[in-house]
Amino acid sequence: MPNILSLTCICFNSVIYPTSFFFAKLPEAYAIFNPIVDFMPVIPLFFFLLAFVWQAAVSFR
């Protein structure tokens, strides 16, 4: 039960402060990876679209 409560608190806190999660800055040593990190959230969408392209290629069997 305490695990569910702590998970609920974590989710509630991330809803209250979403900007700290989505707009956190990388440390200065990793600043060269900023363009890659900005692009990374889009990558799962490509897999989702690839599934549709694949099904279209096999005629949605």
Curated annotation (Swiss-Prot):
Question: Which superkingdom?
Answer: Eukaryota
Q: Where found, per UniProt? A: Plastid, Chloroplast thylakoid membrane
Q: Which residues cross the membrane?
A: 32-52
Q: Its membrane topology, per UniProt?
A: Single-pass membrane protein
InterPro entries for this protein:
PSII_PsbK (IPR003687), PSII_PsbK_sf (IPR037270)
Q: Which GO terms describe its biological process?
A: photosynthesis
User: Which residues are propeptide?
Assistant: 1-24
Q: Which UniProt keywords apply?
A: Chloroplast, Membrane, Photosynthesis, Photosystem II, Plastid, Reaction center, Thylakoid, Transmembrane, Transmembrane helix
For this record, the Gene Ontology CC terms, alphabetical, are: chloroplast thylakoid membrane; photosystem II reaction center
Task: Return the HAMAP family for the record.
Answer: PSII_PsbK (MF_00441)
| PANTHER family named in the record | PHOTOSYSTEM II REACTION CENTER PROTEIN K (PTHR35325:SF1), PTHR35325
What is this protein's function? Answer: One of the components of the core complex of photosystem II (PSII). PSII is a light-driven water:plastoquinone oxidoreductase that uses light energy to abstract electrons from H(2)O, generating O(2) and a proton gradient subsequently used for ATP formation. It consists of a core antenna complex that captures photons, and an electron transfer chain that converts photonic excitation into a charge separation.
Self-association or partners: how does it assemble? PSII is composed of 1 copy each of membrane proteins PsbA, PsbB, PsbC, PsbD, PsbE, PsbF, PsbH, PsbI, PsbJ, PsbK, PsbL, PsbM, PsbT, PsbX, PsbY, PsbZ, Psb30/Ycf12, at least 3 peripheral proteins of the oxygen-evolving complex and a large number of cofactors. It forms dimeric complexes.
Q: What family classification does the UniProt entry report for this protein?
A: Belongs to the PsbK family.
User: Could you tell me what this protein is called?
Assistant: Photosystem II reaction center protein K
The gene name on file is: psbK
